[in-house]
Regions:
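Active-site mouth of glycoside hydrolases
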Residues: 2-237
């Protein structure tokens, strides 16, 4: 596979420009395109108060573009969360404003409200039927690869997330589980705010919650009938 990223408004050309764009990328030899940052405030959820409902006009443009890629034999990949605007209260936390996107990603494995918000948008997108193909995204053979969360690993913003109540609760529960087998495990690190992002104990914690999250997400994707291969290892640099 040899591809390019399309970011933000590049995912929503008018139909005439979409025809030209697809033809040009094919002539250049590309056979894969990543639809990236498509769910920004001006993208697929434009105007949605809850940040979950799909915008009909933006989706029409995206649907047409994707249909043209499929028609030309170009595969598509995307992420189920990159930068979608999410309000704190939309995930059940009584706080004004929006959740920082990296903080939100790190809340998904440890906070039920954040997970359900992720799952609801994923369902809205993947069950959406592209009128230009007649197929739902989950059934699209031209969409064989899906990243569950873009760059969601904990070490990116551990210093910001470790003081949040859901993360502290998850940390305490994890320590209790580990200490049931080894009473001296992570001695002196009951408070996650004392744990550095480079510590071995954080890596162990991160690996455990990541495994549990991905198992849950995979089961959910199977429940929805998703055909694509899945990954949660798009971790940036």
């Amino acid at each position: 596979l040899y591809g390019v990223n399309l970011c933000f408004d590049a995912n929503f050309p008018d139909h005439a420009f979409a025809d030209k764009l697809v033809d040009r990328l094919v002539r250049l030899g590309y056979n894969t395109v990543r639809i990236h940052h498509y769910e920004s405030a001006n993208g697929a959820v434009k105007g949605a108060a809850d940040g979950l409902a799909l915008n009909a006009e933006r989706m029409d443009r995206l649907d047409y573009l994707l249909a043209k890629f499929y028609e030309k034999g170009v595969y598509v990949t995307t992420d189920l969360f990159t930068c979608r605007p999410v309000a704190w209260r939309a995930i059940g936390i009584d706080r004004d404003g929006r959740v920082d996107q990296q903080v939100y990603k790190n809340l998904i494995p440890v906070h039920e409200g954040a997970y359900q918000n992720w799952a609801t948008f994923a369902k809205n997108l993947l069950t959406h039927v592209n009128p230009y193909t007649g197929r739902a995204y989950k059934d699209e053979p031209g969409l064989p690869l899906i990243s569950l969360i873009n760059e969601g690993h904990l070490t990116w913003c551990w210093r910001r997330i470790r003081g949040e109540a859901p993360m502290k609760k998850a940390w305490t529960a994890w320590l209790a589980e580990r200490r049931a087998a080894d009473a001296g495990f992570a001695k002196g690190l009951d408070d996650p705010e004392k744990v550095s992002e480079s510590s071995a104990v954080l890596i162990a914690f991160m690996a455990d919650i990541e495994r549990k999250l991905v198992a849950r997400q995979r089961a959910y994707m199977k429940e929805l009938g998703v055909k694509a291969l899945l990954t949660n290892q798009n971790c940036g640099s």
